[in-house]
Amino acid sequence: MTGRRATVWQESDSSAFLDAVIALDDTTLVAMGDPIDGCLCVVRSEDGGQPWAKVPCAVKDGPGVPASREGEAAFAASNGNLSFAGDTVWMLSGGGASRVYRSLDRGQSWTVFDTPIQQGGQMTGGFSLDFADARHGIVWGGNWEAKEDNTARAAVTSDGGETWTLLADGAGPGYGSSVRYRPGSAGQQLALVGTPGGVDVSDDGGTTWRHVSDSSFYAARFSPDGSALWVSGNGQLGRFPASVLGW
């Protein structure tokens, strides 16, 4: 790399569209995007983002990325399609099918699991996922074209993403574009943005929610120590101290 900019990876397929990127540590990065050649596009770097390598589509039950279903893609709503804990990485799809992919080897090989959230439409499915630890995670999304609909728009897992159960179905906020666990809360405290009403938080793992702000944002991240929630969207960058959120 010379100067301050350089091309470190380029996809030759003109339909390529990357939706999210995540850093597992100082050296390993994983990015994902819409399907190319029959599976979600996944690329990895093991040296801090210099050269990248594309993970191939799996052949039958072999290593790689499992085949995508008709209309399955991903939403670039909040860089929320990827999450990790240790060496385990999860990846979320939406649209024609909304599934959770899991890699136990830092993104090199993947298995995929179904979710019960609404899917099948162009703007339905999961928009964001997060994991509190290697077993407990949450998916949030819904129908972008019917944002008030709070049915089958969120699900949780307690077995590392293999099975999912609908969460607070028909109660609480509707569509959301970014959901995050607060660090240090043992998976009990969450924040949600992208809803029609603004910012909501939960104290019980997502079963019930409190509305804390009418301001609209698209993405959210907690500071590493959980002392503040950072949000962005609509030309704004905001910070909510934990005390303002009731914690």
What are these regions (language model features)?
Residues 1-247:
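Residue-level hotspots at or immediately adjacent to binding/recognition sites across diverse folds
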